[in-house]
């Protein structure tokens, strides 16, 4: 039994009282939400006209085109390119937008777009809008920029931890989050996938950088994503920022500057001017680019100042293909009967249905992997049918959500026993920070130990079925994505794209991950061939404290909460 020492009693009482008072707080009831929708006719925009021209020239009846985005740099520059190219509308829907260097460059580009008359709508889940990241909300007070927060918490934004503690009285609201990730320009070209917005998603964090996958989408599928955005934007759970917080209150939350002992030259360098845009070359062959860059002294893939602002999207390998959007309705997050009725009609359910069609090979990438009994049965059925199943997920050391790993370990031995090939991503990628890229892998180190200048964490969510069907989206294979969060994904039926995705992912299995095997009842982590690393009999690169924490959490944490 815990005891409260006398000297801490008053502080504890104040804390509990504050939490209770915050729990009694409520959201505004009289909120004005002007209805708005995506651009109805984009034929008068350069992006719309370009997509139409490409569609007319394509020798296919498919109405959507796609290009995979594996590298962190391309993920940044493609978004910047769309911002700068937009003439009418920009719609952004994200779970998290961090206030840092890469997003400040995006914000400046968004302000410039708004100044030239582009309508900018930003829909952001409210969970991560505390502390430093609350400064993102300042965009809501710019002309031509509208920002709404989805499923907001009526609690302080002083810090993320305090938001969680002070929202425990409404745990159901706290758990249900909008996890969708959509970026659409002029209702013509879109980006969706696993990435949120921030340094850690664009290879610019001095700590951990996420390895992720997005897909650029043009044509009809972009319009589908826009319709999904509109459904969330005009939903009663979307609150205009101005109805929740004032510009003055946001300014008051700004972190006080701290004098640094030393300043990295990379971080202090002025932003590089926008490079001259490459001219399109009709004879340029379609190739999947290889992205592998050396780490600088700060541990970054490239200096922020050196990141280009744009890329020529015309030079990417675009493929016209049959596709469909998988998306949860906003009512999934609402606490009502409709949501309960739709609990078996989710993005994850659609994904599982597609996975069940596998005949020969299933490749799964899921950073947070807590399958639960239903998914375990599906994996067992696939293995009984002779389907090869490979799963890439995070190791304990690379996982930024220890609780999720605690849920995963309950199923790991069972998966391996049924013949699923399990790979866990290495946290330390010696000497390099790598993105998914054809032939690049996930940091194939040059021997020695697994200690290096950079740390990586898997964040990509993708599935390849029989090398003919590719699914990329925001969902994880866990019960949180199935039951708690709203998600979005694109399923693309095309052998070329599925093969490209496989070529992006497979080097990560062989060079950037441990193969986990079960030998005589003992788990063995097989180090990548040629890495110079030893095999391990316990979670590699993880501290003893972290391993003990997982053992404590694992038997008790419910799957649907992880």
Named regions from a protein language model:
Residues 11-22:
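Bacterial N-terminal signal peptides
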Residues 2, 6, 21-181, 185-562:
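Charged, low-complexity intrinsically disordered terminal segments
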């Amino acid at each position: 039994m815990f005891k409260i020492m006398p000297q801490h009693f008053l502080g504890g009482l104040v804390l509990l009282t504050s939490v209770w008072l915050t729990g009694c707080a409520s959201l505004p009831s009289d909120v004005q939400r002007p209805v708005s929708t995506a651009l109805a006719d984009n034929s008068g925009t350069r992006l719309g006209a370009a997509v139409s021209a490409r569609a007319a020239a394509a020798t296919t009846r498919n109405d959507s085109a796609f290009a995979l985005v594996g590298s962190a740099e391309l993920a940044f520059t493609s978004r910047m390119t769309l911002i700068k190219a937009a003439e009418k509308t920009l719609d952004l829907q994200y779970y998290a937008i961090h206030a840092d260097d890469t997003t400040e460059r995006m914000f400046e580009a968004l302000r410039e777009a708004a100044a030239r008359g582009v309508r900018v709508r930003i829909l952001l889940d409210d969970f991560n809008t505390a502390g430093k990241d609350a400064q993102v909300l300042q965009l809501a007070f710019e002309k031509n920029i509208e920002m709404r927060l989805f499923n907001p918490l009526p609690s302080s934004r002083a810090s993320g931890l305090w938001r969680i503690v002070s929202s425990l009285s409404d745990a159901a609201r706290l758990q249900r989050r909008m996890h969708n990730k959509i970026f659409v320009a002029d209702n013509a070209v879109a980006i969706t996938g696993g990435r949120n917005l921030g340094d850690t998603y664009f290879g610019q964090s001095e700590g951990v950088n996420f390895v992720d996958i997005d897909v650029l989408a043009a044509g009809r599928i972009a319009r589908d994503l826009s319709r999904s955005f509109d459904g969330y934007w005009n939903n009663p759970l979307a609150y205009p920022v101005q109805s929740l917080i004032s510009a003055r209150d946001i300014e008051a939350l700004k972190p006080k500057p701290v004098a640094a002992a030393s300043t990295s030259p990379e971080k202090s360098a002025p932003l590089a001017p926008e490079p001259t845009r490459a001219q399109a070359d009709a004879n340029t062959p379609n190739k999947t680019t290889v992205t592998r860059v050396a780490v600088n002294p700060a541990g970054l893939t490239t200096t922020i100042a050196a990141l280009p602002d744009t890329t020529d999207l015309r030079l990417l390998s675009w493929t016209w293909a049959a596709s469909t959007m998988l998306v949860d309705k906003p009512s999934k997050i609402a606490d009502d009967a409709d949501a309960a009725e739709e609990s078996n009609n989710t993005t994850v359910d659609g994904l599982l249905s597609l996975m069940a069609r596998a005949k020969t090979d299933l490749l799964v990438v899921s950073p947070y992997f807590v399958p639960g009994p239903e998914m375990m049965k599906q994996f067992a059925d696939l293995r009984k049918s002779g389907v090869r199943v490979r799963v890439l997920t995070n190791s304990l050391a690379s996982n930024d959500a220890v609780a999720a790993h605690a849920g995963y370990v309950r199923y790991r031995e069972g998966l391996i026993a049924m013949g699923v090939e399990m790979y866990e991503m290495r946290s330390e990628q010696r000497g390099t920070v790598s993105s998914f890229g054809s032939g690049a892998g996930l940091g194939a180190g040059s021997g020695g130990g697994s200690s290096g200048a950079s740390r990586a964490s898997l964040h990509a969510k993708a599935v390849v079925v029989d090398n003919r069907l590719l699914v990329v989206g925001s969902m994880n294979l866990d019960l949180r994505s199935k039951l708690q969060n709203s998600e979005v994904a694109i399923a693309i039926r095309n052998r070329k794209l599925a093969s490209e995705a496989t070529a992006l992912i497979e080097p990560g299995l062989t060079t950037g991950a441990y193969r986990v095997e079960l030998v005589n009842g003992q788990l063995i982590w097989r180090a990548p061939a040629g890495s110079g690393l030893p095999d391990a009999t316990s979670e590699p690169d993880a501290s003893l404290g972290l391993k003990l924490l997982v053992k404590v959490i694992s038997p008790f944490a419910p799957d649907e909460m992880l």
